[in-house]
Curated annotation (Swiss-Prot):
Pathway: Metabolic intermediate biosynthesis; prephenate biosynthesis; prephenate from chorismate: step 1/1. PROSITE patterns: CHORISMATE_MUT_1. Its EC number is 5.4.99.5. Homotrimer. Catalyzes the Claisen rearrangement of chorismate to prephenate. Probably involved in the aromatic amino acid biosynthesis. This is Chorismate mutase AroH. Gene3D superfamilies: RutC-like. Inhibited by 40% with 500 uM tyrosine, and a tyrosine concentration as high as 5 mM reduced activity to 5%. It catalyses: chorismate = prephenate. Keywords: Amino-acid biosynthesis, Aromatic amino acid biosynthesis, Cytoplasm, Isomerase. GO terms for molecular function: chorismate mutase activity. One of its GO terms (cellular component) is cytoplasm. Residues 2-120 form the Chorismate mutase aroH-type domain.
């Protein structure tokens, strides 16, 4: 069975370093929150960035932490007027039998505003 784990984080500036650091932080917290022990458990990871983030691909950061064999995709988020700026979003597809209600989604920094309904928004 495949489950989706959602996450998002904001960055203060559009630099490769900021995007890579935030992406690594978010991915590692998503894995930890869900008890994922090996990247082999991941079917794929999809990243989106808001249109104001253009200096780096989030997928590069995933490779930096060892996700060399996980299919990765970076794309641009829909530019909705008034939406939160400088956001990196993630959808990780996880091969697991974990029930849907036990999957922990992770929202960090200003991105907690995107999902105030979730306990795991930190």
């Amino acid at each position: 069975m495949v489950r989706g784990i959602r996450g998002a984080i904001t960055v203060e500036e559009d630099t490769p370093e900021a995007i890579h650091q935030a992406t690594r932080e978010l991915l590692l917290k998503m894995l930890e929150a869900n008890g994922i022990q090996s990247y082999e458990e991941l079917a794929a990871v999809i990243f989106t960035v808001t249109e104001d983030l253009t200096s780096a691909f989030p997928a590069e950061a995933a490779r930096q932490i060892g996700m060399h064999r996980v299919p990765l995709l970076s794309a641009r988020e829909v530019p909705v007027p008034g939406s939160l700026p400088r956001v990196i979003r993630v959808l990780a597809l996880w091969n697991t039998d974990t029930p849907q209600d036990r999957v922990r989604h992770v929202y960090l920094r200003e991105a907690v505003r995107l999902r105030p309904d979730l306990e795991s928004a930190q």
